[in-house]
Structures are given as C-alpha cells and as structure tokens.
Amino acid sequence: VQSTDETDDYNFGTWEGNPLDMFAAAITGVNVEDAVLCGEGTIDGQAHKGDWWQNHRVRRGAWRGRLLFLNHCKNITVQGVSFCNSPSWNLHPYFSDDLRFLDISVTAPADSPNTDGFDPESCTNILLAGMHFSTGDDCIAIKAGKLYMGATYKTPTSNMEVSHCLMENGHGG
C-alpha cells in the first residue's frame, strides 16, 4: 500500500512535508485512538547494516522510513521504549492530538543523516518528559507542514511541553 500522490492525507509518511511514497515505519498508526505502547524493549531500525545513510537524499524506490509514524491519531502514550538506528526520523506524529512520550531513549550515531529524534508535524497537545536524545540531526524539530500540506492546511504544531529531557549529539531542541 502506498500514497498515490502529494494530496493523500492518510499516508505512511511525509518527505520534505509532502505525503510521498515512503517505506512504512516499523510501527505505523493511522486513525488510532486511546492506545499505549509501553515496555522496556528496543525498536532497532538497523539502518547502519544497510545503505540507508549513504546518499540519503536519493530516493530508492521510496523514501526512507521512520521508526514510529502516527497519522491522525489521538490519545496515544508511548513509554519506556528505546528507539535506535532509524533510516530517517525516529518519532514522527502527524496531524495527531493528545500525545505523551515518556521515559524514552532515541539514539543514532552522531554522523547519521536526518535521524531526527522527534518531529511532530501539525500536532496538538504533546508532552515529552524524561526523554534521552542522541542523534545525527535534530533532537526535536517542530513542524507545521511544508509545501502541499503546509499550504493546504496551515496547521502549526501547538501546545507542546518538553520537560526533563537530555539532548546530547544532534542539534538540540
């Protein structure tokens, strides 16, 4: 299953702010409500074992996937899980509301390209608490949509609280 064009609101990811063909995230939620992902496990994208980080701006069939992508989701809690070695952004909620990310570790090598830690895009009511970020790009990058989605919906991310988070490698929050 793939997005058919740049106007598909219910897609498996966005690239440069447009809903384009992408590899699905390791964990993908579309229209999910009242869900919890909790545990002490690790979601390892193993991007370092392939060529995901080489020529990272070149599309290979589809754009590089995320580790977690939430599209139009509501009342979601992610707690205690570790995310590492994503091919691209790690945690990417998109047009979602009432999100809590608690006591999570997000890591990637310091030289890994575009491995942002947390990229909320056009989301509302977000809490990040007790997070540890050490990535090859932005630890946190707050987005309002870009190109087609930004021009169409004009929806900035709003009401976001960040507390007790450690940001190491990467560009901070």
Can you say where each PLM-predicted feature lies in the sequence?
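Extracellular/periplasmic carbohydrate-active domains that bind, remodel
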Residues: 1-173
